Amino acid sequence: ADAAHRNGTSIFAGIKFFDHTTGGAANSWASFIMTRNSDGSFRYTHPIINCMRFLGFDGINYNWESTNKYQDADNIAFHKELYKIAKSEGFNDFKIMYYTTSSSLTSYSSRYMWGQDKDNRICEVMLNYDNSDFSWNMGSSVTEAERTMGAADGLYAGVWIVSMDSRWNCPNNQVAKRCGICLWGEHAE
């Protein structure tokens, strides 16, 4: 992690692949992080921030494809709290990345992933790729990101690059080019 940081690269920890092969890991993790103390505060927000800072990690990456637990109010509140703690402790590079089955960020989905304003971020988002290609909704997703956060920083379009025959000109318009790109490698062949 130290070498990555010296070279300007963030390191994401706790990468969880919540797919059908894990036997319900997404639901177990969601239950774990939503545990509250007797005073109503989340039990594991401070320990997670402390652990990541100690180990030199900048954030958490989630693959929530097999569940919709990320839409639960407690999950939203938990992740907002992580951002608030990180900010209060000067952990300014802290990030949470969500990857779901969604290939667009909308006014509806930004309520449970992304956030509604700069002071209440829930996560950053990697849009799911469409048919092994860029999301067709990059432009509208950028518009929603900018409406809520003032910028599209933290919004990424996934593209599956195994065949390399993607619509590489897709981000070539003034709106879509403000979306980051996440190149997605092989996992099926």
For the regions a protein language model found, what residue spans apply to each?
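Substrate-binding cleft of secreted/luminal carbohydrate-active enzymes
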Residues: 155-189
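Chitinase-like catalytic core of GlcNAc-active glycosidases
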Residues: 1-137
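Glycoside hydrolase catalytic-domain groove-lining segments
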Residues: 134-160, 167
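Mature extracellular/periplasmic domains of secretome proteins
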Residues: 113-120, 141-148, 172-174
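Extended aliphatic helical segments
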Residues: 76, 125, 142, 159-162, ...
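Glycine-enriched alpha-helix->loop->beta-strand junction motifs that scaffold or abut catalytic
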Residues: 119-123, 151-153, 176-180
